Design a protein with these regions (language model features):
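Conserved small/polar residues in nucleotide/adenosyl-binding loops
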Residues: 217-224
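Conserved N-terminal/central alpha/beta ligand/cofactor-binding core
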Residues: 2-20, 25, 30, 66-204, ...
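A detector of low-complexity, intrinsically disordered, Ser/Thr/Gly/Pro/Ala-rich segments
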Residues: 41, 74, 155, 225-228
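Alpha-helix N-cap/helix-initiation motif
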Residues: 43, 161, 215-216
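Hydrophobic alpha-helical segments, chiefly the membrane-spanning helices
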Residues: 228-234
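N-terminal Rossmann-like FAD-binding beta1-loop-alpha1 element of flavoenzymes
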Residues: 38-63
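Core beta-strand elements of the Rossmann-like FAD/NAD(P) dinucleotide-binding domain
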Residues: 34-36, 215-216
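Flexible, glycine-rich phosphate/dinucleotide-binding loops
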Residues: 47, 70, 225
Length: 234
């Protein structure tokens, strides 16, 4: 019998799932963040942004990149733009409309709860990108420009000419480099994750292969990556 993968999606109405989850989730005391180690596999737009954000929050982050540099991630290929429900054009946009268009654009194959969460945080993502220095196109008055793109019902696409993916990745890479310099993130380039270390059903580490030496490095916990079981970061 095939085991169904648990998606870990919270219970409840779709518009309330993540709000209720955040309201009842456990918190981390700011003084304890530096004691917690987090492994982020991948340095594309998602991985680099996550590693940089977690490092800036005070966690100890170990970031693994399969390429020579995070700038070689495929996120650079995105051209058209990035959508958010800011409704700058006053054309009736909303979180639900962005959610609906995204699910429909994905041929109804996406997990709807996760897409709704994406729509909820879309405005925050744009704010984060602007803070990272992404040069989005702007109107003559200085406000961020929008255009209608793809299957969207309204004008909600933020863009940087035809180089949106490249500019987003460079912004995330700059934020990541800042945290690497600050010592909160350790970056390991030319490493490929082979497997996840599970302890009682929970991910506690990874098995990574150095693509230069072809040696395997194992870790029962993220903290061991910073000691004798992993080489110093590149």
């Amino acid at each position: 019998m095939t085991k169904i993968i648990d998606s870990k999606i919270p219970e409840g109405p779709i518009a309330e799932k993540w709000t209720n989850y955040k309201a009842h989730q456990k918190l981390v005391n700011p003084a304890n963040k530096r004691r917690l180690d987090i492994i982020v596999v991948g340095t594309g737009l998602a991985g680099a942004s996550a590693a940089a954000s977690l490092g800036e929050m005070g966690f100890r982050v170990f970031n693994f990149c399969i390429q020579d540099s995070p700038r070689r991630a495929h996120s650079i290929a995105a051209q058209g733009g990035i959508n958010a429900a800011k409704n700058y054009q006053n054309d009736g946009d909303s979180v639900y409309r962005l959610f609906y268009d995204t699910v429909k654009g994905g041929d109804y194959r996406a997990r709807e709860a996760n897409v709704y969460r994406l729509a909820e945080v879309s405005n925050n993502i744009i704010d984060q990108c602007v803070a990272q220095g992404v040069p989005f196109a702007r109107e003559y008055g200085g406000t961020l420009a929008n255009r209608s793109f793809g299957g969207a019902q309204v004008s909600r696409t933020f863009y940087a000419k035809g180089q949106t993916g490249q500019q987003l990745l460079l912004g995330a890479y700059s934020a990541l480099s800042r945290q690497v310099g600050a010592g909160t993130v350790k970056l390991y380039t030319r490493y490929e994750m082979e497997d996840v270390v599970l302890v009682d059903g929970r991910a506690r580490g990874i098995i990574a292969k150095n693509l230069v030496t072809c040696l395997l490095y194992t870790s029962p916990s993220p903290r061991d990556l910073s000691t004798s079981r992993m080489p110093s970061s590149a």
